[in-house]
A protein has these predicted regions:
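Short coil/turn segments
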Residues: 9-17, 91-93
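Ligand-binding cleft/hinge of the Venus flytrap
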Residues: 17-36, 66-70
Length: 130
């Protein structure tokens, strides 16, 4: 991320990526400019023609957009923030919650979860059991 200091970064307006930039003042202040785009695809097109030096977006969105475009973009190993997602159950559905938890752990242990993630997201982005 330090290599982006003094550069211009694109971001989808109103996205969680924009919030991540705003919540990381050291990074935000190091940039020459932040260019807002209506959508990530437009930001990536601007990156391709050199309008911005980088684009900040959610990892899943980045993997999907890059894989579909076939462009030679690189995703940095460093992140600005981490987001957590959860599965919601009704309060009295304890048995269902426990069954889903057990199955997710089993799938993580046997590698099924990683295979699914690779297929649909282009990378093993799983956190279950880690």
């Amino acid at each position: 991320l330090e290599d982006l200091a003094g550069g211009s970064v694109g971001v989808q307006a109103g996205s969680s990526a924009q919030v991540a930039i705003d919540d990381t003042p050291g990074f935000k202040d190091s940039l020459k400019e932040i260019v807002e785009f209506k959508e990530n695809l437009t930001a990536l097109m601007d990156l391709e023609i050199g309008g911005v030096d980088a684009v900040v977006m959610d990892l899943l969105v980045a993997n999907d957009n890059i894989n579909r475009s076939g462009k030679d973009f690189r995703i940095l190993d460093q992140t600005l923030t981490e987001e957590e997602y959860a599965i919601g159950f009704r309060k009295n559905d304890i048995a269902l919650r426990d069954a889903v938890d057990a199955e997710l752990l089993a799938m993580a242990e046997d590698g099924t979860l990683a295979q699914i993630a690779e297929k649909w997201f282009g990378a093993d982005i799983t956190i279950v059991g880690k």
